[in-house]
From Swiss-Prot:
Keywords: Acetylation, Coiled coil, Cytoplasm, Endoplasmic reticulum, Hydrolase, Microsome, Nucleus, Plant defense. This is Protein EDS1. One of its GO terms (cellular component) is cytosol. Positive regulator of basal resistance and of effector-triggered immunity specifically mediated by TIR-NB-LRR (TNL) resistance proteins. Disruption by bacterial effector of EDS1-TIR-NB-LRR resistance protein interactions constitutes the first step in resistance activation. Acts redundantly with salicylic acid to regulate resistance gene-mediated signaling. Triggers early plant defenses and hypersensitive response independently of PAD4, and then recruits PAD4 to potentiate plant defenses through the accumulation of salicylic acid. Induction: Up-regulated by salicylic acid or upon turnip crinkle virus or avirulent bacterial pathogen infection. Changing residue 262 to P: Loss of interaction with PAD4, but no effect on dimerization or interaction with SAG101. The modification N-acetylalanine is found at residue 2. InterPro entries: AB_hydrolase_fold, EDS1-like, EDS1_EP, Fungal_lipase-type. Homodimer. Interacts with RPS4, RPS6, SNC1, SRFR1, AvrRps4 and HopA1. Part of a nuclear complex made of EDS1, PAD4 and SAG101, that can be redirected to the cytoplasm in the presence of an extranuclear form of EDS1. Interacts (via N-terminus) with PAD4 (via N-terminus). Interacts (via N-terminus) with SAG101. EDS1-SAG101 and EDS1-PAD4 form separate complexes in pathogen-unchallenged cells. Part of a nuclear protein complex made of VICTR, PAD4 and EDS1. Interacts with VICTR.
Length: 623
């Protein structure tokens, strides 16, 4: 019951998943089983070297960036970094989801029938199952989580698939809970991707043949197996040690030197890992802790055991039948750092140092949670919301009463309220920059980046305060000294806030902000090729409503003929910005606003055909 509560899967589903995974060995690419309200898709594993490291991929670990259009959620929202996955595994998925195959139609049928879908596989078939689950989440589930059923992914001895961004994105979207990966203690396959391709390429073909359960039994005297195991674990050790040093901020000098000239594997665990021993099952859902355990659970207690482990690492890859059959007889532990982990890790053969590193990883996650709580406290203690409310409910209305709006009032800063607004602007920036620092250092839980309450607060802050930052930038003539605000002056806090909001509103449609923006621009019929328009709008403020004033400031001093495309783009975006609350129409059309004063200087022919002509009818009539 405890296992099901943690993972969302029961013993029967695990047994059926393993059974389907065995059947997948007999199929071309995948095997489908249907029983009651569940449909299981099991993927055939491959034990060919080219299906672990794509021959055309020249990188040290066979990795490739995911396609952002196909996998829009698999990235860090703020930084914009896209997740990396193993290219060979990705190509296998692409072949399976090709519309010419039966797979997509089978998934569509299961979706329409309102059946729960389980993706599963043994060995590299598990890698395909992981990517297929992400594909399903992006293509179906994210569009309407209240309609589409939650999928499950159950793997047995699967290799690692993606990098830390892959793991982070699953955590942010709260999808990690859908992935359960069973690992026999010494199984080498979940560790292979932590090794450099150059380290194992000579021995990999032979070892993969030994890993194939359809081939002959393991040769205990085979030197190539020992060599392969030693090289994989040597690289795994380097990765694990570097990771824990980065985690705790105690980087050892030799590791810093080593990492400067030696590439380390980008692959990291994702989801829940269930380690199995003779006595117990140990579930871990902390990626950093899992990485340490992948190394420290496979170590020997003495020299005699060490000589046997390389061959045990092959046999354990064949042991999942026994694991599944004995699950009901084993103790179950969830390694979350709350309870004593000594006995649990002892049973897994983890050394004292290993226990310290696993505990350190679990403690770091606790610190991330504490940091999130502190942010909430700071927002409350610093009267964050009251400061925003003062700008919104007092400062803005008073400025608007003077017919010039709060942007222009702040830019001039002649009144006492302008000084107060500047103080509050600086205080609010301090809070946001503190949060941003924690996000950049990965010192907040993965879920924080996608937290709806935080996104809404950051959006309110960006819309309200960024115009003041733009006004301040131009008041001090930084545009002349440093360059345009959009190119040189825009604080990262606003970029992160903008991207978080865009992800939040576009996610249900499986879209990315850049494509949406350029589709809108293309629909404005500006009379140029899209490539020319993209070059013209590079570093413009038309991609974000809170940057409206930055674009106005850049346009107002230039000849119309030089900036016609930018003017029309700004006008074309403005209506939707007003509707969405990005721009305050009560502000920008005021008699004394910088925008209105600039707009009336535009050529009469332009104004007569402008989408803003209804707002500016008196100006058109006067001119």
């Amino acid at each position: 019951m405890a296992f099901e509560a943690l993972t969302g899967i029961n013993g029967d589903l695990i047994t059926r998943s393993w059974s389907a995974s065995k059947q997948a060995y007999l199929t071309e690419r995948y095997h489908k089983e249907e029983a009651g309200a569940v449909v299981i898709f099991a993927f055939q594993p491959s034990f060919s070297e080219k299906d672990f490291f794509d021959p055309d991929n020249k990188s040290s670990f066979g990795e490739i960036k995911l396609n952002r259009v196909q996998f829009p959620c698999m990235r860090k929202i703020g930084k914009g970094d896209v997740a990396t996955v193993n290219e060979a595994f990705l190509k296998n998925l692409e072949a399976i989801i090709d519309p010419r195959t039966s797979f997509q139609a089978s998934v569509e049928m299961a979706v329409r029938s309102r059946k729960q879908i389980v993706f599963t596989g043994h060995s590299s078939g598990g890698a395909t199952a992981i990517l297929a689950t992400v594909w399903y989440l992006e293509k179906y589930f994210i569009r309407n989580p209240n309609v589409y059923l939650e999928p499950r992914c159950v793997t047995f001895g699967a290799p690692l698939v993606g990098d830390s961004i892959f793991s982070h994105a699953l955590g942010r979207e709260k999808w990690s809970r859908f992935f359960v990966n069973f690992v026999s203690r010494f199984d080498i396959v979940p560790r292979i991707m932590l090794a450099r391709k150059a380290s194992v390429e000579e021995t990999l073909p032979h070892v993969l043949a030994q890993l194939d359960p359809r081939k002959s039994s393991v040769q205990e005297s085979e030197q190539r197996i020992t060599e392969f195991y030693t090289r994989v674990m040597r690289d795994t050790s380097t990765v694990a040690n570097q990771a824990v040093c980065e985690l705790t901020g105690s980087a050892e000098a030799f590791l810093e030197t080593l990492s400067s000239f030696l590439e380390l594997s980008p692959y990291r665990p994702a989801g829940t890992f269930v380690f199995s021993t003779e006595k117990r099952l140990v579930a871990v859902n902390n990626s950093d802790a899992i990485l340490q355990m992948l190394f420290y659970t496979s170590q020997a207690s003495d020299e005699q055991e060490w000589s046997l482990i390389p061959f045990r690492s092959i046999r354990d890859h064949h042991s999942y039948e026994e694991l599944v059959q004995s699950m009901g007889k084993k103790l179950f532990n969830h390694l979350d750092g709350e309870n004593s982990i000594e006995s649990t890790l002892n049973d897994l053969g983890v050394s004292t140092r290993g226990r310290q590193y696993v505990q350190a990883a679990l403690e770091e996650e606790k610190k991330r949670v504490e940091n999130q709580k502190k942010i909430i406290q700071v927002i409350e203690q610093e009267r964050f919301l009251k400061k925003l409310a003062w700008i919104e409910d007092e400062y803005k209305p008073k400025c608007q009463a003077h017919k010039n709006g709060y942007y222009d009032s702040f830019k001039v800063s002649n009144e006492e309220n302008d000084f107060k607004a500047n103080v509050k602007r600086a205080e609010l920036a301090g809070v946001f920059d503190e949060v941003l620092g924690l996000m950049k250092k990965c010192q907040l839980p993965d879920e924080f980046e996608g937290d709806i309450d935080w996104i809404k607060l950051a959006t309110r802050y960006r819309r309200l305060v960024e115009p003041l930052d733009i006004a301040n930038y131009h008041r001090h003539l930084k545009n002349e000294d440093t360059g345009p605000y959009m190119k040189r002056g825009r604080p990262t806090r606003y970029i992160y806030a903008q991207r978080g909001y865009e992800h939040y509103i576009l996610k249900p449609n499986g879209m990315i902000a850049e494509d949406v923006f350029w589709n809108k621009v293309n629909g404005l019929n500006l009379g140029l090729q899209l490539e020319e328009i993209q070059e013209t709008l590079k570093n413009s403020g038309s991609e974000c409503g809170s940057c409206f004033w930055a674009e106005v400031e850049e346009l107002k001093g230039k000849p119309y003929e030089e900036v016609e495309v930018r003017v029309k783009t700004l006008e074309g975006m403005l209506g939707e910005w007003i509707t969405d609350g990005e721009v305050d129409d009560k502000e920008i059309f005021l008699e004394g606003s910088t925008f209105r004063k600039w707009w009336i200087t535009l050529p009469k022919n332009h104004k007569s055909h402008s989408p803003l002509r209804d707002y500016m009818m008196d100006e058109i009539t006067d001119t």
